[in-house]
Amino acid sequence: TFTEQKNTYPLSADGSKYVVNGFIPFSPMIDESIYANALLWTIKNVCSAQRDGITEVSIPAKSFSCNLVLTSQADAKQKNTYYCTAQFQVKDGKLVYYLSNIQIESSVVIMKKVTPMEKLQPEKKPSHQETMDDFVQIESQMLNKLFDFVSTNQLSPITHWNEINIGKPVKGMTEDECL
């Protein structure tokens, strides 16, 4: 599995911004199954309330965006909360991901301080490099869990894409379709 292999997805520069981007092929799965599994996992694991945090869903484009909130692990040296925008799109048997607008919330004495990832200077300050490494570890764990779910979850057939697109449950939908 992706989780067992501990795959990591590093930060890279996109212009002046730090992002995490790439794609994972899921052949021989069909695009609709990849998309449905990715969206279902995100709804169940990322959103605190039903679809809360998902900012855009386009079934025709097989894409969705959400606001991610990731927290340093309990045993980590860092004690940060990370906020970012995640965009996913399925195309030609691949799940494309793009994490951007990465913000770090750290505790400074009794206050919380929010800093854009771009403000960090890892070449000058080792603590900044540790923060970046912490973020990569956490987002990589999240992506690995998502990719494992996409590759292993057996979906019941999804036949109500139009209703899902407008968020309207109808009689005959499966539980997964209603999410």
Specify the residue positions occupied by each region the protein language model found.
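Ser/Thr-rich, low-complexity intrinsically disordered terminal regions
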Residues: 1-157
